[in-house]
UniProtKB/Swiss-Prot annotation:
Principal subcellular localization: cytoplasm
Ranges of biased composition (kind: Acidic residues): 127-141, 196-226, 248-284, 879-891, 923-1006
Positions with biased composition (Low complexity): 68-90, 106-126
S1 motif domain residues: 427-504
Catalytic activity field: Endonucleolytic cleavage of single-stranded RNA in A- and U-rich regions
Keyword tRNA processing tagged: yes
Alphabetical list of InterPro entries matching this protein: NA-bd_OB-fold, RNA-bd_AU-1/RNase_E/G, RNase_E/G, S1_domain
A Pfam family recorded for this sequence: RNase_E_G
Compositionally biased intervals (Basic residues): 230-242, 291-301, 834-843
Record-given protein name: Ribonuclease E
């Protein structure tokens, strides 16, 4: 439309110019004429009676008429005493406007200069108030309300008037509206101090774009008109300083124009009465846009404003905190450089972990009440079984070792093995020799006489003993190469990592742990509150001042004399260790010495684990019985009734592990894949960095409900089994668990809570971390000793433990899979279900040339060929003498009609006869048995590769998990959707295929009776035609 056309708002045309534009808007015409939009609208209404708005478009003729009418009107209405002002032409006023624009343009580049006062025009403004009030009362033409400020030379005109005019002091508010008001006289003059125009004003106004210029220009006269009314405060201007006025004008120009285009004159009067409130509201809603513009200006300039500088966008008394740029903050180094910390990195890491734990809301486990403590103890029946066994493999053939198994409700949850080869070093105390100190690693390597050096980190150094309690704690200041240092092994060597050492020595007893040099005591939170209070009173009298203790759970109900004797025994042992270390240090023998070694694993497990929680302790073997019996009688005679010695019924009777089915459970624990009772699976992989557990549904398809319920049940079952596997395999370090994705947050919390409750039975130190963004559960666990797999396995000498075979040439995975399946199907017909049948089909086609022992059927006996011969006018007996190519021509004419119906039947017949001949030559094996064997083989392959019915929802529903190997498989992709039930039903009929139905199976029976041929040598050309599957008589192989 014409009114939507964008016109130049910043027009500087004056009446001195020869002509007006062909088309222009009302507000632009009012600006050119130096009057208000209301007067222009009134003049236009007098001409034709039409109702217009400030955005209406007028042509040149109407504009000339309005200019003529408005030029004559002021001269006629001006009083005689104001004749000098009336004689002043309007053109002069416009010239002054143009000059004023030039002054503003210059002032933007430099400091603002006060303009000439506009006092001569003030009386004219007072005189015109009465006339314009009368016109405003009579006029009822609708006119939308326009807010904002017109931009002349990138500045609002109203701002130019206030900033560049020496305005007289404020006077009483006028009660009458002036009839005519020149553009450059402030309707409500206020005292104002000129402010320095910042360079950011240009950016602020420029960023608003052409639309902001258009809207603000259209609203200038409307603002002037509203400002003439009594008690009207100009939004963002009066009494609020330049800063807030600029903010309101700039921020509201875009929003107000769009929201007020369709309002009427009555709306304008209502908005005029509420202008104060609306102005404040608009400034609040658009404050975010102003802040964004400030940020853009900072990014353009490259640096922010100083704290002392006042931003023009902020109101007075506003405290602005601006973040200093990174370039100013990092004076010493650049962002690309690596930053360091003062002091020990490992000590800082400890402090950071504590802070992160507090920030994350992690709390210590709650102290149990006595009822909860007894309920937890009685909830599970625990049994400990010990077996002595003789080695049967070199190099220590004939040696004895001891196995210890802990059962909870008949299920093995922990396993320990003790032997000379797998002896644990944890707890041993050595007088080591420092080999080298690495300040950059904050670690020292110490020779402890075990072949491989142990590592001592800065976080494990006893700084008080080293004399660096209050100084800068650096490991190079505490240790030097060649120094003797008393260290204790805190972690066994694993893989290529040496033993972990610490100088904070602790001695474990039956009821407590003695810590020399410590000053604090600790009590296990697994004890009830009443027992903790009793033990605290005992420790105040028992513990010496130069040591600390940690109470174990085994001290529950123990008398004060037993605890005192335990403390005195451990204190005496520490005195002996110190004396021996001082003696060796004085001699300077130059070799590491073992100061104290922990007892045998058997004694350690009995000391640490066997308490009132166990209902019985069953021991098999004389040597183990003597050791356990003597130790328990010495330290815990109240537990003697729970000891039982196992005596086999005869020499061939099963041992104690076989009776409790422990060997069977240990054998399953050696596997990589663990089957859940419901059919789900766990895949446990151990790497150098962490242990990863993957949860799969396996053959678990649910027992009702939707997919979310099925997945949650599988995850709940997996959470308990994962904790059991961690304890049984003694997996330590970082453990990451990939549960199947659940949609509901409540189900995720339920699984995590079940995992935490199961870990409460684990006596080792563990911590469940947060769930990652990918849905992985992280936890850490302290290793007790040698793991189950590590104790009974060694790395493969061929592949180095990687489990792969390397070749010199690249291996084609497709050909290798196809060869494996064809070999297995040829040997025993492996591959259950449809996969097995397709494999057998391929094998039959490959071996058809070698097995060809079945003679070709006489074509004339087939009913279809009889009909073909009759149609061609030939005799049945003449068909044998015809050339083979004539047969192919006749067959091709009918192949398109019957090939789709008989293709599967012929294929099934061929496979049946070929397999029959092959089996007869091999020994007349049963086809059903071969199918069952192939089904078993396929199940074994699916364990290693994929399950056809396995549901995997781990990372994304649209992505294929590695457990569903559809891509790259030798079979068709649609077989992956087949279930085991379908495979079992298909195995009962070896001739069925996924495209066949019961009707096709019924049709196969009479065909087999018709095609029983005598065993003769087949023709080679017919064999080639049968391989190509023509629509003709099938070849009976």
């Amino acid at each position: 439309m014409a009114e939507d056309a964008h016109t130049e708002d910043l027009s500087t045309q004056t009446p001195q110019q020869e002509g007006l534009p062909e088309r222009l808007r009302v507000h632009s015409l009012a600006r050119v004429l130096g009057t208000t939009s209301r007067r222009v609208l009134d003049a236009l209404a007098e001409f034709d009676g039409r109702q217009r708005s400030a955005h209406s478009t007028v042509d040149k003729a109407d504009a000339e008429r309005v200019r003529a009418a408005l030029t004559e009107s002021p001269a006629a209405e001006t009083p005689p005493e104001e004749a000098p002002a009336a004689e002043t032409p309007v053109a002069d006023l416009v010239v002054v406007q143009a000059e004023q624009v030039e002054v503003v343009t210059v002032s933007e580049a430099g400091p603002a200069e006060p303009a000439e006062p506009a006092e001569p025009e003030a009386p004219a403004a007072e005189a015109e108030a009465e006339a314009e009030t009368e016109v405003a009362d009579e006029a009822e033409t609708p006119e939308p309300t326009f807010r904002g400020a017109v931009l002349v030379g990138d500045e609002p005109e109203s701002r130019l008037i206030l900033e560049h005019a020496n305005i007289p002091p404020a006077r009483e508010t006028q009660t009458e509206r002036p009839d005519y008001l020149p553009l450059f006289v402030a309707p409500q003059p206020v005292s104002f101090e000129p402010a320095v125009v910042d360079d950011e004003d240009e950016d602020d106004d420029t960023e608003t774009g052409a639309e902001s210029d258009f809207d603000s220009g259209a609203d200038s006269d409307s603002d002037d008109d509203q400002a003439d009314r009594p008690r009207r405060r100009r939004r963002g201007r009066r009494g609020r300083g330049r800063g807030r006025g600029e903010q309101n004008d700039d921020a509201t120009s875009d929003a107000d124009t769009d929201s007020t285009e369709d309002q009427t004159d009555g709306d304008e009067q209502e908005s005029g009465e509420d202008s104060d409130d609306s102005g404040d509201e608009d400034s609040t809603t658009t404050e975010g846009g102003t802040r964004r513009r400030r940020r853009r200006r900072r990014r353009k300039s490259g640096s922010g404003d100083s704290d002392d500088a006042v931003s023009p966008d902020d109101p007075p008394n506003t405290v602005v905190h601006e973040r200093a740029p990174r370039t100013e903050r990092s004076d010493k180094s650049d962002d690309s450089e690596i930053q360091g910390i003062s002091g020990s990195t490992r000590l800082e890491a400890k402090r950071q972990r504590r802070r992160d734990g507090r920030d994350a809301g992690r709390r210590r486990p709650p102290i149990l009440s006595e009822a909860e403590f007894l309920a937890r103890r009685e909830a599970v029946e625990r049994t400990m079984i010990v077996r002595d066994k003789v080695r049967t493999e070199p190099p220590h053939e004939g040696a004895r070792y001891t196995q210890i198994a802990v059962l909870e409700d008949g299920v093995v949850v922990e396993h320990f093995v003790t032997s000379a080869a797998s002896a644990s070093l944890v707890g041993n105390i050595y007088l080591g020799i420092v080999q080298n100190v690495l300040p950059s690693m904050e670690a020292a390597f110490v020779d402890i006489g075990r072949g491989r050096n142990g590592v001592l980190y800065a976080g494990e150094v006893n700084w008080e003993a080293a004399g660096l309690g209050g100084q800068n704690r650096k490991i190079e200041q505490a240790l030097k190469p060649g120094d003797y240092v008393v260290v204790q092994v805190s972690k066994d060597p694993v893989g290529h990592k040496g033993a972990r050492l610490t100088t904070q020595v602790s001695l474990a007893g039956r009821y407590l742990v003695y810590v020399p040099g410590a000053s604090s005591t600790g009590i296990s939170r697994k004890l009830p509150d009443t027992e903790r209070q009793r033990l605290k009173e005992i420790l105040r009298e028992v513990v010496p001042s130069d040591a600390g203790v940690i109470i174990r759970t085994a001290s529950e109900g123990v008398k004060e004399e037993d605890i005192r004797s335990d403390v005195e025994r451990l204190q005496k042992r520490w005195s002996e260790i110190e004396a021996k270390a001082a003696e060796v240090t004085e001699k300077k023998a130059g070799a590491a010495v073992a100061l104290y070694e922990e007892p045998d694993v058997l004694v350690k497990v009995i000391r640490d684990l066997f308490n009132e929680d166990f209902s019985s302790l069953i021991v098999s073997g004389d040597e183990a019985w003597n050791t356990i019996n003597s130790y328990v009688e010495a330290v815990a005679p109240d537990l003697m009734p729970r000891l039982t010695k196992y005596e086999p019924a005869g020499p061939d009777a099963p041992d104690v592990f076989a009776v409790h089915r422990i060997d069977e459970q240990l054998a399953k624990a050696m596997d990589r894949k663990v089957w859940l009772p419901s059919g789900g699976t766990l895949v446990i992989d151990r790497t150098e960095a962490m242990t990863v557990v993957d949860v799969n549904t396996g053959k678990f398809t649910g027992s009702g409900g939707n997919l979310e319920q099925t997945v949650t049940r599988n995850n709940l079952e997996a959470a308990e089994e994962i904790v059991r596997q961690l304890r049984l395999r003694d997996i330590g370090g970082i453990v990451v668990i990939d549960f199947i994705d659940m949609v509901l947050e409540s189900n995720r919390d339920l699984v995590l809570r079940r995992l935490t409750e199961a870990l409460a039975r684990d006596r080792t130190r563990h911590q469940v971390s947060e769930v990652t963004s990918l849905g992985l559960v992280q936890l850490t666990r302290k290793r007790l000793g040698t793991g189950l797999v590590e104790a009974f396995s060694t790395a493969c000498t061929h592949c180095g433990g990687r489990g792969i075979v390397l070749h010199g040439d690249p291996i084609d995975s497709a050909s290798s899979n196809g060869g494996r399946k064809s070999d297995s199907s040829g040997g025993g017909g492996s591959g259950g279900g449809r996969r097995g049948k397709r494999g057998k089909k391929g094998a039959a086609r490959t071996e058809e040339v070698h097995v060809a022992k079945v003679p070709d059927h006489t074509p004339g006996e087939h009913p279809m060929f009889k009909a073909m011969a009759a149609a061609n006018g030939k005799h049945e007996g003449d068909e044998d003498h015809e050339d083979h190519e004539d047969h192919e021509t006749a067959e091709d004419t009918t192949a398109a009609e019957v090939r789709d119906d008989t293709r599967d039947e012929h294929d099934a017949d061929e496979r049946a006869h070929v397999v029959t001949a092959a089996v007869g030559a091999a020994g007349d094996e049963d086809l059903d048995d071969s199918d069952e064997d192939s089904d078993l083989d396929s199940d074994e392959e699916s364990d290693d590769e994929s399950d056809e019915d396995e549901i995997e929802l781990d990372d994304d529903e649209d992505e294929l998990d590695e457990d569903i190997e559809v891509i790259g498989d030798s079979d068709d992709s649609d077989d992956s959707d087949d279930s085991d039930e379908d495979d079992d039903s298909d195995d009962s009929d070896d001739d069925s295929d996924e495209d066949e139905d019961s009707d096709s199976d019924e049709d196969e029976e009479p065909v087999r009776e018709v095609y029983e041929p005598p065993v003769t040598a087949p023709r080679a050309r017919v064999r080639r035609r049968a391989a190509a599957r023509p629509a003709g008589p099938p070849s009976h192989d």
